[in-house]
Amino acid sequence: MSETLKTQPYSKRAEVHPSPVARRLFNLMETKKTNLCASVDLTTTKEILDLLEKVGPYICLVKTHIDIVSDFSYEGTIVPLLALAKKYNFMIFEDRKFADIGNTVKSQYKGGVYQIAKWSDITNAHGVTGSGIVTGLKQAAEEVTDEPRGLLMLAELSSKGAIAHGKYTEETVEIAKTDKDFVIGFIAQNQMGGSDEGFDWIIMTPGVGLDDKGDALGQQYRTVSEVMSTGTDIIIVGRGLFGKGRDPSVEGERYMKAGWNAYLARTNQL
């Protein structure tokens, strides 16, 4: 993201973005005044739905790991999830991290038990298998639904010792350039460039915390102001919202305000 794009309001970027998913997301963020994504790594449908009833008003996006839901069913899990997304006006991002050849990910995305392409606005993929992964996922989406879908590439990770950096990150960016309409951005800790070639990538950053600096399993947290200053568009927060002793409604509003104020400061709107 260039300095010019970095200081533009989300609504301005929505006006010219080639992806309908990105346009919808940017406009939603402006309408709700939030750039918060809730990461709901919970293992039952009830836990997920109950949490979203509490944080739904404060988020633009929910990030799911649907394959850890022990009682998953399309009717029992996805239908009410979609209803909550409509009720509270947020989008859905299934954090699937696809990492196989194009033909395989095509089947994984559109079929199986989860039918991800049918209900998730956004998903993500590693670049390790090359650009065929983008082609396969896009084809799957087009075969399953008329609704627009978007893909994030995993350029950088927030865990200690992650090898997604340097040359790997550079090659992942090159893969992203192969499809301007379907690839909407990155999971990353920093800007990924591209603006000089006409790309406006959405940067979503995990590992954001207002209180904790890390955990025992290698997660490293950065503050909201830190990540926003390095080009993040959407902050991804999980345990900071619903960890032990936390009130999700209170924390949701707290992170929403922190993220939005950091965005307003970056875009000179304060």
Swiss-Prot record:
It comes from Candida boidinii (Yeast). The lineage of its organism: Eukaryota, Fungi, Dikarya, Ascomycota, Saccharomycotina. Pathway: Pyrimidine metabolism; UMP biosynthesis via de novo pathway; UMP from orotate: step 2/2. This is Orotidine 5'-phosphate decarboxylase. Its EC number is 4.1.1.23. It catalyses: orotidine 5'-phosphate + H(+) = UMP + CO2. The active site is at K97. Substrate binds at residues 41, 63-65, 95-104, 221, 239. Pfam families: OMPdecase. The gene is URA3. Keywords: Decarboxylase, Lyase, Pyrimidine biosynthesis. InterPro entries: Aldolase_TIM (IPR013785), OMPdecase (IPR014732), OMPdecase_AS (IPR018089), OMPdeCOase_dom (IPR001754), RibuloseP-bd_barrel (IPR011060). SMART domains: OMPdecase. Belongs to the OMP decarboxylase family. Gene3D superfamilies: Aldolase class I. GO terms for molecular function: orotate phosphoribosyltransferase activity; orotidine-5'-phosphate decarboxylase activity. GO terms for biological process: 'de novo' pyrimidine nucleobase biosynthetic process; 'de novo' UMP biosynthetic process. Coiled coil: none annotated.
